[in-house]
Swiss-Prot record:
Protein name according to UniProt: Adenylyltransferase and sulfurtransferase uba4
GO-annotated biological processes: cell budding; cellular response to oxidative stress; invasive growth in response to glucose limitation; Mo-molybdopterin cofactor biosynthetic process; protein urmylation; regulation of pseudohyphal growth; tRNA wobble position uridine thiolation
Encoding gene (name): UBA4
Region listing for Disordered, in residue ranges: 33-54
Principal localisation: cytoplasm
Cofactor: Zn(2+)
Assigned GO CC terms: cytosol
SUPFAM superfamilies recorded: Activating enzymes of the ubiquitin-like proteins
Amino acid sequence: MEEADKRAEELRAQIAECEATLQSLKEQLAAAEAAKTPPYSDSTETDRGSSSSTWKWPLAEAEYERYGRQLILPSVGIQGQLRLKAASVLIVGAGGLGCPASAYFAGAGVGTIGLVDGDTVEASNLHRQVAHGTSRVGMLKVDSAISYLRELNPLVKYNAHQSHLTPENAESIVSGYDLVLDCTDHPTSRYLISDVCVLLRKPLVSASALRTDGQLIVLNTPAAPQADLSGGPCYRCVFPKPPPPDAVTSCGEGGILGPVVGVMGVLQALEGIRLLAAGRHLSPSPEQQQTAISPSLLLFSAPPDGSPAGFRSVRMRGRRKDCFACGEKSALSLATLREGGLDYVQFCGGSRKPVALLKSEERVSAEQLNALLQQQAGEHGKPVLLDVREREHFEIANIPGAINIPFSKTQNPGARHNAEDTPKLDWLPDGVADGHSPVYVVCRVGNDSQTVARQLKEFGLDNQGKRFIGDVKGGMLAWKREVDSTLPFM
């Protein structure tokens, strides 16, 4: 068996090496093909057999062939294509949104595409982040995405910004681009990106996706100066206050359906291409002042019950007079940003802090729980293990004997009292409320379990301290680390 495992490992290593070599050859081929393409110039020289003549058309021959299907659209045409070619787009985030968005910008022939991301590719990314591949796991996302984009279209210039966007580097990075896409997944980055776009007068296309829902909005278009209320609203105009930290759910916690985030990323590219082809990113002459398009928030939902997926548009107001970033009395400045005068983490409520609702003696480690479960029933009976993860997590993997009670069900106020207003937890299994067996609560990482354990105590299930009720420190993540390393953890 060990010999077979060793051989399998050797084969995997050889496959990875061959895939890396193949990827390198593909990139060399793309570079060679790009080198033979007539350069971007109105006076490109092209060889026709043994003779040469002056190329008199505004695009190179390869570009007419590549972009022909969109060139014949009234909304693009030759002028629109020339605007796309001359334009530059910055995509902040090379993940589920940034991958499809960057692919369609590259396919459309946008002249320069910049990618900002400091993360590396993980296997858990691959079901939705379509520019990455198995052979590039561990590679910086911007490098992985650009290798994919170069193969898609070698005629585009690609810039890799191998770090996260911060208040200190935002100005130097964003200033070199005509349009910005917010493809991040956290409020702190969304407010930062919006603020720097206001200060540098850059249009912004922002989107988000979680579970089976998504939303998109075009901001700061037209990109008027601060205090000019004729400009498009910024992110702070739409969301003056950030959501509380506990209400922010990541893809890792809430899940995401790949095509949903793909739809939103493609829509970001669509809005960006429309904006660039129409020249709405360009500063108009005085007689051609742009008028702000009535902003709207586009909502997408693919209901899990199988009903038809669809879109809904919600009209939004324009710029707010009292907006901190773009309003009439805004004090926001590039100097403040450069000097770190704005703490976006603090503004958004800080990092989510570990929950500390129970005393240390009310908590057990995963190893301790495992030992307790292996023992014979004590004088108070066999321990009761309540797993308060949502059903989908529980069904993937669970501890044998655990009873699943989804946390969302435990927080339903209507289920806490019976008709006579006597304290009762209707979601508890029969026999648990009136029994004497110790109760252990486990969740994903040890936060929700504390909430439920305290709730059980508040309703008197601990028999005035005679019955143990507590939780498992670190939750199922600790169980994987300390007890069962094979447990699939989501």
